[in-house]
Design a protein with these regions (language model features):
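Aromatic- and Gly/Pro-enriched helix-to-coil junctions and flexible linker segments
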Residues: 1-66, 70, 84
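Concave beta-strand-loop units of leucine-rich repeat
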Residues: 48-54, 79-99, 104-149, 153-187
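A local structural micro-motif
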Residues: 27-28, 75, 183
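Short secondary-structure junctions
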Residues: 71-77
Length: 187
């Protein structure tokens, strides 16, 4: 295992093996690795009863294909669910207006990773329209926190990651209004 760390999981070892087999390019995106669906779901691991307990229709595959062509990674959270995880990690220029591309599938999205994107506080109003959003990652963005209270209407939001943001501590109190929030990552 890494010094002072935990042993890599079987999935992590397999992902690294795929990366090495495909040429080990540090610029290669997750989407370019062409991982098996079981390995893709590793990036969006779930625990029982973590996500909303509602039945939801599947999203048209053509819509997912369209988003992927725009470097927006979309994947089911597992094989038996119509819920989706969305990541813009490969689209650094994803901005506040680009969220409109996700509105058509907003009911299916439970996890969004906007890390290292170009979003700002303006995103909070639109995100408040995603009823099943459970995990929100805003790591390494320009988010300051103004308007974050708009997310308090999201009854399923359990985790927010605000690591390496410009989050202003004046907005911390707003987070106490969130009924389901279990964890906030902020440093």
């Amino acid at each position: 295992p890494p010094s002072g760390g935990k042993q890599l999981s079987k999935e992590e070892i397999e992902i690294i093996g795929n990366w090495i087999a495909s040429g080990s390019s540090p610029a290669q995106s997750v989407a370019e690795l062409k991982l098996d669906e079981n390995l893709k779901s590793y990036f969006f691991m779930t625990k029982t009863n973590f996500f909303p307990d509602v039945k939801i229709l599947a999203v048209d595959f053509e819509k997912i294909k369209e988003l992927k062509s725009q470097k927006i990674f979309v994947s089911p959270i597992n094989k038996s669910s119509n819920f989706l995880s969305v990541s813009t990690i490969n689209k650094k220029d994803f901005n506040d207006k680009d969220i409109d591309k996700l509105l058509e599938i907003k009911d299916n999205i439970v996890t969004i990773d906007f890390s290292k994107s170009s979003i700002t506080d303006s995103i909070f109003l639109r995100l408040s329209e995603f009823p099943n959003l459970t995990v929100l990652r805003l790591t390494d963005t320009k988010v300051r926190g103004e308007g974050i209270e708009k997310l308090s209407v999201l009854e399923n939001l359990k985790r927010i990651n605000l690591v390496n943001t410009e989050f202003d501590t004046a907005f911390l109190k707003s987070l106490t209004q969130f009924k389901s929030l279990e964890k906030i990552y902020l440093f």
